[in-house]
Amino acid sequence: MAIFIRKMHPLLKIMNHALVDLPAPSNISLWWNFGSLLGLCLIIQILTGLFLAMHYTADVSMAFSSVVHICRDVNYGWLIRNIHANGASLFFICVYLHIARGLYYGSYLYKETWNIGVILLFLLMATAFVGYVLPWGQMSFWGATVITNLLSAFPYIGNMLVQWIWGGFSVDNATLTRFFAFHFLLPFLILALTVIHLLFLHETGSNNPLGINSDADKISFHPYFSYKDLLGFFVMIFFLTTLALFMPNLLGDAENFIPANPLVTPPHIKPEWYFLFAYAILRSIPNKLGGVLALLFSIFILMLVPLLHTSKQRSNIFRPLTQIFFWLLVANSIILTWIGGQPVEQPFITVGQIASISYFSLFLIIMPFASWCENKILSLN
């Protein structure tokens, strides 16, 4: 009877097609676990965020104190806050690995799924940015001031745009209140887009490591991949709890333990680690507007990847030349992340500029050209 309910009930039928009887390629590897891990991350962040919002006060005179109150006086408030703060880092680790897998195995050729994924990344970054402002520490305040000020680079409307976002002539109470509203709202928008992301994915079915049609060799999602995902859940929760309980401030900034002071600028303003690669690209261009456009393009360049696919093969698994350049891109992104956390002085400026040029060159010129060369080598036989 249970089988019939699962397959006949209008609501359960949708769940069944998405989670139980979903046909999945039999050879998908560990790299296909990150989609479900991102779903788990999103649920953890929404739940912990909801409990934090119950005790947080979005007011410049009380925001910092309310976070201290959560950590000291609320039952397990310190744990909820540590899980929420470190959960964001884990979220971005999973996102970057998910994107890397998509780039390596050619999953970007499912254009609708991929483009919605890029929009999801942009929304996730926006959510993390406005969330980082909420504790109202020094780095929160100055990070908000510096990043929002970048919008003034746009001609004609720039200054008006900045003041409109600030709700005044500086980052103040109006800014904090609206950032809290955005931080509360955006995760639910991410949740809605995630459903659309999955709808498009289930239209085409999952890609696989070989990058070939796997219709002849599909197995049901449950129990095979549901248990495989469950292992990933346990591993991720282990890492998250280890980070939250033993090293909760490892990925944070010490400056944020100081209440926001508009009269004292921190010696080195930098965002959270997961934005450092884009921040390094922003800083590597001397022109303000050019830097802002490069910052945006560093993320939206992912939308061009399907258009720049010149190879006759989908996956990188049998393409040694493209593999080399893919791993160079990974190394380059790590170098950019390191540079973004360093002060603006030599040799970091030059290294950042070289890494930024390499980042865009690999996407726009080198990898498409490598694919074209591989096609030529294949046609020799």
UniProtKB/Swiss-Prot annotation:
Cofactors named for this entry: heme b
MF (Gene Ontology): metal ion binding; ubiquinol-cytochrome-c reductase activity
Localization per record: Mitochondrion inner membrane
Residues reported in the UniProt entry to bind a ubiquinone: H202
Cofactor note: Binds 2 heme b groups non-covalently.
Family membership noted in the UniProt record: Belongs to the cytochrome b family.
Name of protein: Cytochrome b
